[in-house]
């Protein structure tokens, strides 16, 4: 029990607010030892401080911080708690204690500490940031959004808070309009703070509640009425110039059934205007501001919008008319004609497309010419620079190759331009703090294999993330590889080598790697375990592997949808996919098809083919994965999943803090069958 004065204050508390004359030098000495990595010396000096100045909060703070840096996370909170008792009115002491509790995974205790810190100092952005982080860990999205927003109000250039904020709001949906939220989401899409696909659902929600935009969009049952009103006044211009609407159309396939139908009707309106010689000649800035991005959206989603036979005939006639006009001289071509044709057919498919590049065009047209002519030309030119490392002979491999030559997947536009790079071992320790991870010999400069790199999102992100890494990215499809190489050059990524190869033949290269990643690939092989064994054979001792497999449980609606598609005889062609989508939506009204019709992949033709029409698909169970891991000298490090999912798992299985018990995860998945709809994504390490 503390002895109190008559005024109710503890003498030690007052002492904690006085800085002894000789203390600063000793505190600085502790800090210097920590900065130089002499943590044992720093701990002894900090202990000396607490012995010399037991009533001084800074001494206990230094000890707590040193203990935390040494990894003695359980010993750190008592020292920092002592600092709080000595100086309860200092926000920093509460924040330090919150940091210690957060390291221990005691998020509710950390939340209380950070809440006290911001109450004492409501203008300290870092405390708000940490409060937002623990709210996020606890699944309190609304409270996390409020905290991160406060950080950005106090310090708009706080990079970590920007990323945390958009990652948080990407999981939320709102009922009332917020200008801050709207403009921030528009910036995040335009500048690609995170993958645009992660923001499109939120963007559709925000458009629907924007009082200046939603009247233009109509409703699910009356989209046509809103379309007819589009040409009144400057409505087209207002929509086209709206930063969020514009950024979404130009960045990512639209993931919203109502908005997709509205855009489909808007495309028909564009066709009707362009087919009319009088309307086509009136290609004013307002029309181009709206219809130009709409045509870009059509290219991005691979022309997935449904189209009647009559409409396609009219579009084909307009395309033929455009080709004739170009042959007679590009100066006679109406900009709106180009935009309308580009909304139905890729411009590179026109035999006379080079002539279009010879003329100066308004921005709305020039952007389309870059997207649909110049960039595909660059990809064709890059094909000859991509080496072939192995033959492709397996029948299934050849069928999969053919699919991705026809439909490179995904057709992404933007990725975050820069990611803070980290050493691979540090990254894994941050991902899986409760797991014992063996030392990776070449962690400082790892050799990385991306087996099945697709159109480049995966290798580009890995090349940026893993510090001083050298990446080999292979795929079956030359169309995908040339897209990936163009995008990597566009982003200035220089540590990736792209090559064509079959995973089944990679063992013939006699190469080994510190990190191997193959996400969403092995389940498309004739036998996934065969390919998996090839990759394990190429992994160095203590090397790590990131994999992604479809879940048998989570894909149940996809399996049912594939049965329905086969029953109706829809072909894996552009027309077949366009016909199947409304049919599946109709079935979903009476027989839920779950994520099969709600996945973002449903809203792009190439992605929908990958989702529902793939030529080869296996699905695994956690029992199969566990058996392979045990039989092939691997150890399970953990799943990459949302904090809320991990929190729910810990609530269900508190005795597994590392979250590595796959039998527990199998129970969890049975109870929560959509947990792994995307995929099982996890990390492994190869044992000696």
Language-model features, listed with the residues they occupy:
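A short glycine-rich, Lys/Arg-flanked "PGG" loop and its adjoining helix->strand segment in the class I
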Residues: 529-541
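Conserved SAM-binding strand-loop segment of SAM-dependent methyltransferases
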Residues: 492-504
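A short acidic, Gly/Pro-enriched loop at the edge of an enzyme's catalytic core
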Residues: 506-516
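A short SAM/SAH-binding and catalytic strip from SAM-dependent methyltransferases
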Residues: 514-527, 551
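Rossmann-like AdoMet/SAM-dependent catalytic core
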Residues: 187, 191, 210, 577-688
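Conserved SAM-binding loop of SAM-dependent methyltransferases across substrates and taxa
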Residues: 455-468
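Alpha-helical solenoid repeat scaffolds of the TPR/TPR-like class and their adjacent stem/linker regions
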Residues: 1-445, 460-463, 540
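Conserved class I S-adenosyl-L-methionine
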Residues: 544-594
């Amino acid at each position: 029990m503390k002895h109190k004065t008559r005024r109710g204050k503890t003498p030690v508390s007052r002492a904690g607010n006085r800085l002894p004359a000789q203390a600063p030098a000793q505190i600085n000495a502790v800090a210097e030892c920590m900065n130089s990595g002499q943590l044992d010396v720093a701990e002894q000096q900090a202990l000396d401080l607490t012995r010399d100045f037991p009533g001084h909060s800074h001494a206990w703070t230094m000890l707590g911080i040193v203990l935390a840096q040494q990894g003695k996370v359980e010993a750190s909170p008592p020292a920092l708690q002592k600092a709080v008792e000595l100086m309860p009115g200092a926000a920093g002491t509460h924040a330090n204690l919150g940091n210690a509790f957060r390291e221990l995974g005691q998020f509710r205790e950390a939340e209380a500490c950070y809440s006290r810190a911001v109450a004492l100092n409501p203008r300290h952005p870092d405390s708000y940031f940490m409060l937002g982080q623990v709210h996020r860990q606890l699944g309190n999205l609304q409270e996390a959004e409020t905290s991160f927003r406060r950080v950005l109000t106090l310090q708009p250039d706080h990079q970590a808070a920007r990323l945390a904020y958009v990652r948080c709001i990407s999981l939320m949906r709102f009922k009332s309009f917020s200008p801050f939220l709207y403009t921030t989401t528009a910036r995040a899409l335009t500048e690609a703070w995170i993958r645009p696909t992660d923001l499109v659902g939120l963007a559709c929600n925000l458009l629907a509640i924007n009082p200046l935009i939603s009247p233009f969009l109509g409703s699910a049952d009356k989209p046509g009425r809103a379309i007819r009103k589009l040409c009144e006044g400057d409505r087209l211009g207002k929509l086209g110039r709206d930063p969020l609407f514009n950024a979404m159309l130009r960045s990512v396939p639209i993931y919203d059934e109502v908005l997709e139908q509205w855009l489909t009707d808007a495309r028909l309106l564009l066709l009707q205007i362009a087919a009319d010689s009088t309307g086509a000649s009136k290609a004013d800035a307002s029309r181009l501001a709206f219809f130009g991005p709409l045509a870009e959206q059509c290219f991005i989603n691979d022309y997935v919008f449904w189209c009647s036979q009559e409409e396609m005939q009219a579009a084909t006639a307009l395309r033929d008319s455009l080709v004739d006009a170009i042959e007679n001289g590009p100066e006679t071509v109406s900009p709106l004609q180009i935009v309308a044709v580009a909304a139905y057919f890729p411009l590179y498919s026109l035999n006379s497309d080079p002539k279009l590049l010879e003329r100066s065009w308004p921005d709305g047209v020039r952007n389309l010419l870059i997207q649909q002519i110049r960039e595909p030309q660059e990809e064709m030119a890059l094909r000859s620079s991509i080496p072939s490392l192995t033959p492709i002979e397996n029948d299934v491999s050849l069928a999969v190759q053919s699919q991705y030559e026809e439909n490179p997947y995904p057709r992404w536009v933007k990725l975050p331009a820069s990611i803070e790079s980290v050493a691979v071992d540090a990254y894994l320790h941050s991902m899986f703090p409760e797991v014992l991870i063996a030392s990776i010999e070449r962690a400082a400069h790892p050799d990385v294999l991306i087996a099945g790199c697709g159109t480049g999102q995966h290798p580009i992100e890995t090349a940026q993330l893993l510090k001083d890494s050298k990446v080999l990215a292979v795929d079956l499809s030359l169309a995908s590889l040339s897209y990936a190489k163009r995008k990597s050059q566009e982003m200035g990524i220089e540590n990736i080598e792209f090559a064509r190869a079959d995973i089944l033949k990679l063992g013939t290269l006699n190469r080994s790697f510190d990190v191997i990643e193959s996400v969403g690939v092995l389940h498309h092989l004739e036998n996934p375990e065969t390919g998996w064994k090839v990759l394990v054979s190429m992994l160095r001792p203590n090397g790590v592997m990131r994999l992604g497999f479809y879940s048998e449980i989570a894909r149940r609606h996809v399996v049912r949808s594939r049965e329905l598609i086969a029953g109706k005889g829809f072909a894996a062609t552009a027309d077949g996919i366009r016909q199947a989508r409304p049919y599946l939506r109709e079935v979903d009204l009476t027989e839920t098809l779950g994520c099969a019709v709600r996945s973002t992949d449903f809203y792009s033709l190439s992605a929908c083919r990958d989702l529902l029409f793939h030529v080869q698909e296996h699905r695994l169970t956690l029992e199969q994965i566990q058996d392979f891991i045990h039989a092939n000298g691997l150890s399970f490090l953990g799943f990459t999943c949302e904090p809320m999912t991990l929190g729910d798992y810990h609530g269900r299985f508190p005795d597994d803090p590392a979250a590595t018990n796959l039998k527990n995860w199998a129970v969890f998945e049975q109870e929560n069958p959509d947990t792994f709809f995307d995929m099982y994504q996890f990390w492994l390490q190869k044992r000696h």
